[in-house]
């Protein structure tokens, strides 16, 4: 609930900006491809957002120590999809390089119901898996391995989304 409050505060302050696709001179807002508005979470952020980032950083360090994952950094942002918006099929390897290793999505949507839409469609070897964006659900998957789509929802869809990196980050 505290993280949802931090999201609401950023939204009320007008800090969520339309997300772009592409890189360099090809970078552009393309609502037909990606329909979310985002606000980056920084290590220096205080309150629930900073605490959430700190907790995931602790998980990164534990994974490195116990599983030798070699994860170097973490980046996260709040994401808001307005009703009817989604994100076309893609994988999370950055155009700048393949340093994204694990993708993370933490959902903030209270009282989500079947029929609200907004599912994450994750493509697996056994076929697509639909994951409803219900509050307090954390989804993690290999960034370069799994193509995925955010299906349009009939109501606002909120999450914290990010990546563990290997390399420069």
Where does each model-flagged region fall?
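Fe(II)/2-oxoglutarate oxygenase catalytic core
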Residues: 1-103, 107-138, 144-169
